[in-house]
Amino acid sequence: MEEIGAYLRENQKELIERIRRGKYTPDPVRRVEIPKPDGGIRKLGIPTVKDRIFQQAITQRLTPVYEPLFSENSYGYRPGRSAKDAIQKVKEYAEQGYIHGVALDLPKYFDTLNHEILLNILRRNVRDERVIQWIKRYLKSGVMEDGVVMETEEGSPQGGLC
């Protein structure tokens, strides 16, 4: 972590200028496979520390726009909400007499995410086209697996912030 701090201090002005000019290019994410409880494998895309910092800046920009639009019953990847909160809400519903629930998983959702559809949806609420282009660059930045970089024409790596 100390090394990245030194890197950012030394290159801060150049990085900020590249971001402002729209010339910032994220690095490909590093592919990591982790086992799933059902025996399958989940492929994660781990961004560089530098890109994580930039993704956090994008997240801070998007959260105030999108957070008010989400359902009160949505808990995943939400600020101030946890799996423990979701379990507590299920308990509350059970105590109120509810006996049915729905578990939903969209298979391969992150692997097949259509970039253009996502970007067009984002444009409905994000007026700054630079933010849209930054997100597009992340989506298209590629995945490095076993030292080989593969292009990403669809999908979004799980593991980053965006």
Language-model segment annotations:
Residues 41-70, 154-162:
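Conserved pre-motif C helix in the palm subdomain of viral-like polymerases
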Residues 1-2, 35-44, 71-73:
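Glycine-/proline-rich flexible loop or hinge segments
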Residues 18-23, 27-32, 37, 72-73, ...:
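Conserved polymerase palm-domain catalytic core
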Residues 3-25:
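Amphipathic alpha-helical blocks
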Residues 12, 16, 29-31, 41-43:
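A common structural microfeature
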